[in-house]
């Protein structure tokens, strides 16, 4: 389930890139990942500041809208 620090996919697509690793300290607005859907790339930016605690997806993985991409603690 998505918690306060969960960054979720705003749309379905494929993970194009992941810009952070577990332990990365991020600020609001930092790039976390990029999702590609129908040849359009969508940047996923941090909504909260903190430390990346988990990344339950990997590059090339198909995700649905609402899927947790990055957990920030």
Task: Give, region by region, the residue ranges found by the protein language model.
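Structured functional modules or segments
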Residues: 1-73
């Amino acid at each position: 389930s998505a918690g306060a620090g969960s960054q979720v996919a705003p749309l379905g697509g494929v993970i194009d890139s992941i810009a952070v690793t577990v332990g990365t300290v991020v600020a609001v607005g930092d790039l976390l990942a990029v999702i590609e859907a129908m040849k359009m790339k969508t940047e996923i930016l941090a909504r909260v500041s903190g430390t990346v605690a988990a990344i339950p997806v990997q590059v090339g993985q198909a995700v649905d809208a609402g899927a947790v991409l990055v957990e920030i603690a």
